[in-house]
Amino acid sequence: MFYKVSKEDEYLFLGKRKRLVEQLKEKGITNTDVLKAIETIPRHLFFDQSTARPAMLEHAYSDKALPIGAGQTISHPFTVAFQTEKLEIKSGDKVLEIGTGCGYQTAMLVEMGAKVFSIERQKSLYDKTKLFLPYLGYRTIRFFYGDGYKGLPQHAPFDKIVVTAGAPYIPNDLLMQLKVGGIIVIPIGEGEQQEMNVLKKNSEQSFEKQVIGKFKFVPMLQNKV
């Protein structure tokens, strides 16, 4: 665990996180490492503290998406847990995250033992999160400001890739940067809802794909950096 629990957190928010874990179990999340990370990470700290209202903090451990600024949101805890579970993270995995946002998913990946490379196109979020996560103790993450569609070819290949915004299609650059045997989890769709796509790379030309459930994400925009 990277986060040092305060007395206030121990008596208030830690209990809320435990209840959230039970809710996620009821919704089908079974990976014990994912559930442990959810119980550990102080989600209530990932909102903009300059604008966060008491009512918003009250819902920090509800299964809701909430605004974090720059027109972006922190995803539902179930969505974060679902994507993380589908990645099948192993300790030491090199993971590319598209869309750092407030860093909650990023922290999940680190708690799972991953070596994280994270890209964010919103400069204000990039500037904030690259300081905030190390402050919480997550000091091994490599942060990048840029276009997620292009990935990070200079640091490829990756064991796993997770995309935290809804894309109209699966960018070929990301598929090229995935190791053989690796997994990419990405929501696809241009409407209000997207379908979660889970692809395993069997060879340089062959992928095994699953489409699982509908989710709601902010759009993944190209050439907007």
What are these regions (language model features)?
Residues F2-L96, Y104, M112, L125-D127, ...:
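Class I SAM-dependent transferase core
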Residues K86-E208:
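Conserved nucleotide-cofactor-binding alpha/beta core module
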